[in-house]
Amino acid sequence: MESAADRLARAAAQGRVHDVRALLEAGVSPNAPNSFGRTPIQVMMMGNVHVAALLLNYGADSNCEDPTTFSRPVHDAAREGFLDTLVVLHGSGARLDVRDAWGRLPLDLAQERGHQDIVRYLRSAGCSLCSAGWSLCTAGNVAQTDGHSFSSSTPRALELRGQSQEQS
């Protein structure tokens, strides 16, 4: 027999708002992991902002981390281009400054996929590419962040910039 946590995760993954609401109202925890160890907010249909809002209103952890990839729901929303869901997650306390297992921020993922609306939102929320340190930055990221394009002189400029920041 399928557990309540599995039913809630499946309903969230399929974007079935009515079923998600019914299960939450019946007392199923929005943070209970399914049989694969994932919570409903981790497996929800990212494009259904109503499911996200409902789970969050019932106390889902907007910062839950995937134990394998270290990604969080904001990484998924940014990568897949779901601005409305990202806004709801952020409004519920989701951190935008966390990196996944490959060192990528949600902003990096949105930039890689060309989701400029998400890039604009994340920048307006105070995010910047490579905000956690130079070791994980690419030269192109830093050049773009500063409003420049990448050129053959960029690596030397980055080296000098990094040295001046270390001395500060």
From Swiss-Prot:
InterPro entries: Ank_Repeat/CDKN_Inhibitor (IPR050776), Ankyrin_rpt (IPR002110), Ankyrin_rpt-contain_sf (IPR036770). It holds the Pfam family Ank. The gene is Cdkn2a. This is Cyclin-dependent kinase inhibitor 2A. The modification Phosphoserine is found at residues 152, 164. SMART domains: ANK. Changing residue 127 to S: In strain: BALB/cJ, C57BL/6J and MOLF/Ei. Residues 148-168 are annotated as: Disordered. Heterodimer with CDK4 or CDK6. Predominamt P16 complexes contained CDK6. Interacts with CDK4 (both 'T-172'-phosphorylated and non-phosphorylated forms); the interaction inhibits cyclin D-CDK4 kinase activity. Interacts with ISCO2. Gene3D superfamilies: Ankyrin repeat-containing domain. One of its GO terms (cellular component) is nucleolus. Acts as a negative regulator of the proliferation of normal cells by interacting strongly with CDK4 and CDK6. This inhibits their ability to interact with cyclins D and to phosphorylate the retinoblastoma protein. ANK repeats lie at residues 3-32, 36-64, 69-98, 102-131. The lineage of its organism: Eukaryota, Metazoa, Chordata, Craniata, Vertebrata. SUPFAM superfamilies: Ankyrin repeat. GO terms for biological process: apoptotic process involved in mammary gland involution; cellular response to hydrogen peroxide; cellular senescence; epidermis development; glucose homeostasis; keratinocyte differentiation; keratinocyte proliferation; mammary gland epithelial cell proliferation. Phosphorylation seems to increase interaction with CDK4. GO terms for molecular function: cyclin-dependent protein serine/threonine kinase inhibitor activity; NF-kappaB binding; protein kinase binding. Keywords: ANK repeat, Cell cycle, Cytoplasm, Nucleus, Phosphoprotein, Repeat, Tumor suppressor. It comes from Mus musculus (Mouse). The keyword Phosphoprotein applies. Belongs to the CDKN2 cyclin-dependent kinase inhibitor family. It is found in: Cytoplasm; Nucleus. Changing residue 90 to R: In plasmacytoma cell lines. Changing residue 90 to Q: In strain: BALB/cJ, C57BL/6J and MOLF/Ei. Its main location: cytoplasm.
